[in-house]
């Protein structure tokens, strides 16, 4: 009888999770801007706290942040919409340029008596760089579509920041089973917030370093759309493991096609070097053991949240999974499931 009851509860829990995920998937147009606003508010909360500690009135700190966030969003939307439109119009020429570059390479190799033949027809049939460029355009326009309603998005962030001092206590009261558990739940919420703030803060710094490095490199090499590629590198660097690779491929392809092999290979080496230094030296040193997620879980979370919430889900995959792991750790009944998400180092 007890086994049947446990099985019934398990099946009921699985069904509830499936229904919730289906609801989130259907309501993605509402959920995605809300999540984006929530994480922006979480990132900005230490700034508000630092300003109020320096005796800046709370209302003035929020007003200044409102102006700053609005300017950043207007810049991003304006940049992506204007540059991406021009970039999209230039995509058809990439196939022709590829044929020219391969012809140049064939002539160079034949000059040194190296056998290499590849006809224009073969190139036209099997290689299409516009596929990569169209993907980049879709990603940019997708993100732009999410943040295009700047005013509403910023207002939600500001209201969240205004409610932040009391929101933690309210939420703790909702999830507490008894009044005596409120303080304990507040500590659990603090753990979630500190983990997410720490990760997003460090990731923002390293993403900014990557974006600035890419911009300086492309400007020095006179590669077209340098500001667009720098912005793309900044945004996609939030995607763990593969984000920097996704950002690097179209940059290298465009540099090879528009600027020639010399500059193209130079850009490839430069972009790889920037990502190696930031991703393998600076970020691990700053991050330390803060992440607490296994590599497999990071990759699977990227696929799952990307499927559920699109591009923004990929950007927020790690903080969402970190929040889930910490939330599972906070309850004795679910702590064992948190072990599945943790790094092997946590259990040594």
UniProtKB/Swiss-Prot annotation:
It holds the Pfam family AI-2E_transport. The chain crosses the membrane at residues 7-27, 28-48, 60-80, 139-159, 196-216, 223-243, 245-265, 267-287, 296-316. Belongs to the autoinducer-2 exporter (AI-2E) (TC 2.A.86) family. GO terms for biological process: transmembrane transport. GO terms for cellular component: plasma membrane. It is found in: Cell membrane. Keywords: Cell membrane, Membrane, Transmembrane, Transmembrane helix, Transport. It is a multi-pass membrane protein. This is Putative transport protein HI_0338. NCBIfam families: PRK12287.1. InterPro entries: AI-2E-like.
